[in-house]
Amino acid sequence: MTRQFCIGPLTALALPPPRLLEAAARAGADGIGVRMLPAAPGGIAHRLMDDAALLRETLAAKAATGMRILDIEMVRIGPAFDLEPYRGFFETAAALGAAHVLVAGDDPDEARTAAAFARVCEALRPYGLSADFEFMPWTAVRDLAAAKRIVAAAAQVNGGILVDALHFARAGCQLHELDDVPPGFLHYAQICDGPLRGPATLEGLIHAARCERGLPGEGGLDLKGLFDRLPAQAPICIETPSDTRAPVLGWDEWLRQAVAASRRVLRGVAGR
């Protein structure tokens, strides 16, 4: 099986899903992700669960392009997490034929987070969807070790960890930490690049992650070392937002370069 490369929604968040499917297909990608709920209050999201016309158009574009929907973003688990408002989100993810739902954590209580994550997994299981916990250095679940504890404690067959190359580096994670993560936890991973040293402030860290990432191979991250420790056939989500470069090049060219760079960097990387 050939490794698949999909465009993450953050790479071209302004494009509604039908247009992103078409642009990603022209760029040589295998699929896309869809952000149906925002990463932060007021952020961009394409709420297909509330827009039947946009959902129909997205499904039509998916069929016309032959592309897949890799993942749906995002569920945020806070101290007062309530699963019920997400039911329509989950149903729409299944209707799109997605494989994974991205989860982030804002609750400092790990036991409570693990219990909530288990409920998310249980709700997704009938749809054949996995729940994948993405650690981010500015959230309550800031690194690989914390995500591993939560996913292990939840003990759900469809629970996993999403490794983002930038977050892995900025959280100070070490490559050897991946050796103890069960391969079954690692359903897919996100690729990008950036300077070896990250911004000094929290605000700078968040801005770089959300608005200004580099194409794979043009920064200082050890991408070959990282992906050599991830499952060889795990799909790749290309997450390369750039508020400065993408508008100059145009979406088609930016996505084309992102796909080509990702394939080039991972060519010959065996994985495990």
Residue ranges and their predicted role:
Residues 32-33, 70, 101-103, 131, ...:
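Hydrophobic residues within beta-strands of alpha/beta enzymes
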Residues 46-54, 81-88, 108-115, 139-142, ...:
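Alpha-helix N-cap and loop-to-helix initiation/capping positions
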